[in-house]
C-alpha cells in the first residue's frame, strides 16, 4: 500500500510540475487591460492576437520571429472583466491564455504570423495543448478587422483542402475585443525561468521544434 501511495504522489508531483501552472509569488487581482501599447516605442507597430496553449510557450515562439518587436502574455476571448491567473485556471472565465504580438508590417505580415500559429501547435485538439487541458488552453485565431478575418478563413480552408492535419481543425475564429495583460511574473517567463520543469520539458522543446521547421522566418542569432 505504501508503495502505491508513493507512486501516486510521485506521479501527481510530476504532473503538477510539468503543467503550465505555478503558484504565483503575488497575485494581481486586476491585471491592466492592454488596449494601447504600454510604451510609446510600440505605437508604430501593428498587433495580432493568438491563443494556442500555454502562453509561456507561445510568447517565446513569437519572440523568435523576424519582424516581431514585442510579445505580451495575457487573457482574451471571454467575458469576465479583469480576470486574474487564478480565475483563468478554473476554466470558467471564457478567456484563453493569449499573446499580444506587436509586429513591423514592413518586415512580417499577418498571414505569416498566422502560419506561425498553425505551425507551432495542434489546432485539432479541443481545449488542450500537450499536457495542458481546459478551455483556457483552447486554440483561437483572433481578427481585428474583416481583412484579417478573411485571411484566417481562407488559410483554414487551404489547410483543410490540403489535408495538412489528420483531424478536423477546431480553432476558433474570433473577433478581438479586449486583451488583459497577465501578471508581471508571466512576462518573458520562459526566458527568465529556463530551469522551471515545465519550461525544460515542454516549452523549450516546443520552441526548438518550431525553429527547426521554420529557419527562414527567425531573427538572426546574436
Task: Give each language-model segment a name.
Residues 1-6:
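Positively charged n-region of N-terminal signal peptides that target proteins for export
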Residues 7-19:
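Bacterial N-terminal signal peptides
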Residues 16-222:
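Flexible coil/turn and secondary-structure edge motifs
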Amino acid at each position: 500500500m505504501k508503495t502505491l501511495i508513493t507512486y501516486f504522489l510521485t506521479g501527481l508531483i510530476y504532473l503538477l510540475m510539468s503543467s503550465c501552472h505555478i503558484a504565483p509569488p503575488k497575485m494581481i487581482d486586476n491585471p491592466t487591460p492592454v488596449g494601447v501599447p504600454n510604451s510609446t516605442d510600440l505605437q508604430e507597430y501593428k498587433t495580432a492576437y493568438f491563443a494556442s496553449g500555454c502562453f509561456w510557450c507561445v510568447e517565446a515562439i513569437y519572440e523568435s520571429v523576424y519582424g516581431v518587436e514585442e510579445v505580451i502574455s495575457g487573457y482574451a476571448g471571454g467575458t469576465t472583466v479583469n480576470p486574474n491567473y487564478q480565475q483563468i485556471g478554473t476554466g470558467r472565465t471564457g478567456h484563453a491564455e493569449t499573446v499580444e504580438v506587436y509586429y513591423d508590417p514592413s518586415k512580417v505580415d499577418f498571414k505569416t504570423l498566422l502560419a506561425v500559429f498553425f505551425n507551432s501547435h495542434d489546432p485539432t485538439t479541443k481545449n488542450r495543448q500537450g499536457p495542458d487541458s481546459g478551455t483556457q488552453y483552447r486554440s483561437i485565431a483572433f481578427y481585428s478587422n474583416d481583412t484579417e478575418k478573411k485571411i484566417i478563413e481562407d488559410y483554414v480552408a487551404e489547410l483543410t483542402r490540403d489535408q495538412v492535419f489528420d483531424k478536423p481543425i477546431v480553432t476558433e475564429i474570433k473577433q478581438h475585443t479586449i486583451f488583459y495583460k497577465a501578471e508581471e511574473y508571466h512576462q518573458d517567463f520562459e526566458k527568465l525561468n529556463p530551469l522551471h520543469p515545465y519550461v525544460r520539458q515542454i516549452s523549450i522543446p516546443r520552441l526548438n521544434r518550431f525553429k527547426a521547421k521554420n529557419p527562414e522566418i527567425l531573427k538572426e542569432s546574436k
